[in-house]
């Protein structure tokens, strides 16, 4: 297992004495202690594909070409990679002093993009930039990353912690994640496979996920909402901050399992991760130019949280749908004769699924009615 690296960028202080990292407010010892403390969090995500490499500068993962299971799933395997962050949701985590969920978000944002192509997540790397190494905060973040990797079925192979007190204010941090997966080239899901008559299934989101938090935080400030207060409109006794920090749902395990249950026919033709841009802005990336996706807005109930935000921010409906997922976090386009079977398989593994529309001849548009 490669060690987690901690990079220290000092604050340049003017002094007549010899300068040191410690004198510049940067602790090498604290960074090394943190890196040493999280080995268990990394190892619990590792399977037999991970090759132990003590003291290495990079991680290694074996593609088990000679294993029968791998040969059954992959004849022409291709690597798939993507990267993403959590955006200003980290500011909300800072305000609430709750850091364990944004690590899950970090994994979700990348692996949910990865599986759009039908790729099996293999490994994940994280990058954490901080003002100062704070052991408990960083431990909570990486704990969330570890939990996210376990949910996605991929290995947390390593990471970087950059201490930069010149760039970040005290208490501030930022996150970036990088995911790599493998897909069978002939079974990659994309717009080219979509046909008129295909059915659009929507998988329920767990909340706001990780997009639109600049607007969310503006609403909280504008309406003078209290993050530590429970609001009856949200149908629960959890404080608002906790509701807003609900981690992004990771769809990897259920989606990949469902796709693989159809060993011969490719019944899932395209997919979309619903992030910034809303359902229309993301689904249109997964349909061809000669087709439209006709979406029935009445096919699912918009969760109370979105109406709560809309009310307190006086946000127009069109803006809400352009910014937020509105209760649908992932879409799958499937052949019509298999739509009911795919829905039942997804529900069996814990997803809430709505039949939200169909594909028709058109001009590459998503039409919401």
Regions found by a protein language model. Give the residues of each.
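N-terminal amphipathic/basic leader segments beginning at the initiator methionine
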Residues: 2-4, 8, 12-51
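Short, acidic (Asp/Glu-rich) active-site segment that either coordinates a divalent metal cofactor
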Residues: 83, 174, 187-241, 280
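Short, acidic Gly/Pro/Ser/Thr-rich loop/turn segments
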Residues: 31, 67-68, 86-89, 184-187, ...
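Hydrophobic face of alpha-helices
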Residues: 35, 139-142, 213
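Glycine-rich phosphate/pyrophosphate-binding loop regions near the starts of catalytic domains
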Residues: 40-206
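Acidic-glycine-rich active-site phosphate/pyrophosphate-binding loop
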Residues: 77-81, 85-87, 191, 228-229, ...
């Amino acid at each position: 297992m490669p060690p987690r690296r901690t990079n220290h960028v000092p604050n340049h202080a003017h002094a007549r004495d010899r300068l040191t990292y410690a004198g510049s407010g940067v602790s090498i010892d604290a960074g090394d202690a943190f890196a040493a403390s999280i080995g268990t969090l990394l190892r619990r995500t590792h399977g037999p594909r991970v090759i132990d490499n003590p003291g290495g500068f990079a991680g290694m993962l074996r593609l088990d070409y000679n294993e029968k299971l791998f040969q059954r799933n992959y004849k022409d395997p291709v690597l798939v990679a993507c990267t993403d962050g959590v955006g200003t949701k980290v500011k909300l985590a800072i305000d609430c002093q709750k850091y364990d969920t944004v690590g899950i978000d970090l994994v979700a944002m990348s692996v949910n993009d990865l599986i759009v192509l039908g790729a099996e997540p293999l490994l994940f790397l994280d990058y954490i930039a901080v003002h100062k190494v704070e052991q408990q905060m960083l431990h909570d973040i990486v704990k969330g990353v570890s939990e996210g990797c376990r949910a996605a079925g991929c290995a947390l192979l390593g990471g970087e912690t950059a201490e930069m007190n010149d760039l970040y204010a005290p208490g501030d941090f930022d996150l970036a994640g990088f995911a790599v997966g493998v897909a069978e080239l002939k079974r990659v899901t994309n717009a080219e496979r979509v046909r008129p008559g295909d059915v659009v299934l929507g998988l329920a989101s767990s909340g706001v996920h990780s997009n639109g938090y600049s607007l969310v935080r503006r609403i909280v400030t504008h309406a003078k909402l209290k993050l530590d207060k429970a609001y009856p409109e949200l149908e629960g006794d959890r404080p608002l901050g906790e509701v807003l920090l609900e981690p992004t749902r990771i769809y990897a395990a259920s989606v990949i399992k469902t796709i693989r249950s159809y060993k011969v026919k490719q019944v899932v033709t395209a997919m979309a991760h619903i992030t910034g841009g809303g359902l229309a802005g993301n689904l249109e990336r997964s349909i061809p130019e000669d087709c439209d996706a006709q979406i029935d807005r009445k096919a699912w109930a918009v969760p109370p949280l979105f109406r709560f935000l809309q009310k307190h921010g006086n946000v127009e409906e069109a803006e809400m749908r352009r910014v937020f997922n509105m209760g649908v976090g992932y879409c799958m386009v499937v052949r019509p004769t298999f739509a009911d079977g795919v829905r039942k398989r997804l529900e069996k593994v814990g997803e809430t699924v709505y039949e939200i529309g169909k594909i028709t001849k058109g001009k590459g548009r998503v039409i919401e009615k």
